[in-house]
Amino acid sequence: LIELKTTDADGKISFIADLPIDGTYYVKELYAPDGFVTTGEEQEFVFEYQGDKEVEASYEFVFEDEPTTVELSKTDLTTGEELPGARLQLTDENGAVVEEWTSTKEPHIIKELVVGKSYTLTENKPADGYATAESITFTVENTAEIQKQVMEDDVTKVKISKTDITGDNEIEGAKLTITDENGNIVETWTSGKEPHYIEKLPIGKYTLKEEQAPNGYVVAEEITFEVADTAEIQKVAMKDDTAKGRLIIEKTDKDTGAALKDAEFELRDADGKVVETLTTDENGHATSGLLAIGTYKDGKFDKAATYYLVETKAPEGYQLDETKHEVTFTYVDDKTPVIEVIQKVTNEKLPEDTPFVSNPKTGDDTNLWIPALCLILSAGGLIGMGVASRRKKKKGGR
């Protein structure tokens, strides 16, 4: 090594040296400037004698360096196509921003990145409908070839379930709508046997609204949900409750229409099982709790339920109504959560001088001795009167 120098601001170097005549010498670039590639090019020259009048000899060489070229692609994970609309940033090892840009349908080219240095590609905002990708760090190699770096974005994924109140059965036939924060309709569909799957919803808040519930169900309240910045499947569930029934009993005197209190009833299902026991108040009213209006199979309304109202104890002074009243609830619409049925029941008064008996249970003869005793006493009186009469006749005959 005769001499080592670095180019000046103009990219030039001058070597001045006393060199032996007829020697072969070489000029070689060892290190390229920042952002360029070392070619390894070597220039050779022979220092020849040019006569006693030439004191100096000069040689001129040109070394052409090529810049580094890095191609940065932002693509769809599934299709591999360039993805426009993502905001990207490239920083150096010290965190200084080298360049910022928004992706297009073509790869982004950056030249003159320093060989041997590491850079980080960061996505500051993904394209609409995509999740933010992880940052990529790469090192620039000493080559004039295009160096490619690819950052892939996956789409957002949302799975929406429309189920019954148990959450176990998907409900078919519900009409649903999703709107964004500005009230714009993003998607509409009718629910089926499987959850509804949506891709590419931009990150942000949305509202799920049920426009119409299936037969037998009531429209659910709106749900606000947020699509998070993740490529994982995000789940949203909306549950529909069934419409319910409520029985209202109005108990009155058959003749006067006066309200009757303390009448007792059993509400039984189709199998005869007692669902509820009801007693009328001073207004002659009794109200049941919420009742199933029917049965459901695989999330669908199957058939209407049938109930029977039976009076088990009449109000004091009234005859027991032995009618078995059938009660059913007819589904109205998806905006009516409770269907009310009014059952009017009347009682006739007991005949006058008829003692009131409080409906004894089967096998209970506690009070039966009273009328029996009356009959016995009456019969005894009649017999006594007959004997006395006969005795009087005998006396008269004497």
Which residue stretches match the model-derived regions?
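Solvent-exposed loop/turn and edge beta-strand elements of beta-rich ligand-binding domains
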Residues: 1-398
